[in-house]
C-alpha cells in the first residue's frame, strides 16, 4: 500500500523483457554468443495482480516489438506507449505509422517525448527539413514560429484518442536540448 502513497502510476520499463529477453553468457565480452530466452509472460502479471492488486500501470512497449510482445501488452490490459516525436521519422512516413496520433488506440498513453528523448524544440531543430515539413503538414500549421511550435505538438498529443497524455515540463516550457533529462 505504501507504494501507492508515492506514485499514482507505475510504468514498467522494457516491457518486452517479460515476453523475451536477450541472454549473454557470463564473461562474454560481446553479445555474439547471446540468445533469446522466454520471459515470465502474463503469468507474472496475473500473480502480482492477485497478490498486490494493480493501481495504474503503463507498459513501455517501445523499440523492437514483436507480435508476441504486442499480444502480451493486449493480454495484460495495460496501455502501451506512443511517443509523438517518433511519428515524423521519414523512414516510416506512411499514414499507417503507429506513432501518428490518428492511429493511437484509446488504451494507450501518449508522451511528447520521454526522459531519453530530446525536448520538443530540440528535436524539431534536429530533424531534417523534410521531416519538419511532414510534421507541419500533419499539424496543418505552416505559420507558427519554430520556437512556439511545441505548443502545437502538445495540443496534438492532447487531442489524440490516447486515454492519458504525459508532457515533460521541458516541453511545456519550450526549452531546448540543454534542458533534456537524459542522453542515453
Summary of predicted features, one role per range:
Residues 1-184:
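Active-site and adjacent substrate-binding regions of carbohydrate-active enzymes
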Amino acid at each position: 500500500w505504501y507504494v501507492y502513497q508515492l506514485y499514482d502510476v507505475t510504468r514498467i520499463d522494457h516491457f518486452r523483457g517479460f515476453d523475451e529477453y536477450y541472454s549473454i553468457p557470463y564473461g562474454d565480452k560481446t553479445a555474439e554468443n547471446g540468445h533469446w530466452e522466454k520471459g515470465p509472460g502474463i503469468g507474472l502479471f496475473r500473480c502480482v495482480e492477485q497478490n498486490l492488486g494493480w493501481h495504474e500501470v503503463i507498459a513501455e512497449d517501445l523499440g523492437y516489438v514483436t507480435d508476441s510482445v504486442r499480444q502480451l501488452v493486449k493480454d495484460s490490459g495495460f496501455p502501451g506507449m506512443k511517443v509523438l516525436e517518433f511519428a515524423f521519422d521519414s523512414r516510416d512516413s506512411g499514414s499507417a505509422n503507429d506513432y501518428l496520433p490518428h492511429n493511437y488506440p484509446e488504451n494507450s498513453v501518449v508522451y511528447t517525448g520521454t526522459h531519453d528523448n530530446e525536448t520538443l524544440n530540440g528535436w524539431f531543430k534536429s530533424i531534417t527539413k523534410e521531416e519538419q515539413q511532414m510534421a507541419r503538414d500533419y499539424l496543418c500549421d505552416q505559420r507558427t514560429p519554430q520556437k512556439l511550435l511545441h505548443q502545437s505538438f502538445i495540443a496534438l498529443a492532447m487531442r489524440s484518442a490516447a486515454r492519458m497524455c504525459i508532457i515533460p515540463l521541458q516541453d511545456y516550457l519550450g526549452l531546448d536540448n540543454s534542458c533534456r533529462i537524459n542522453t542515453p
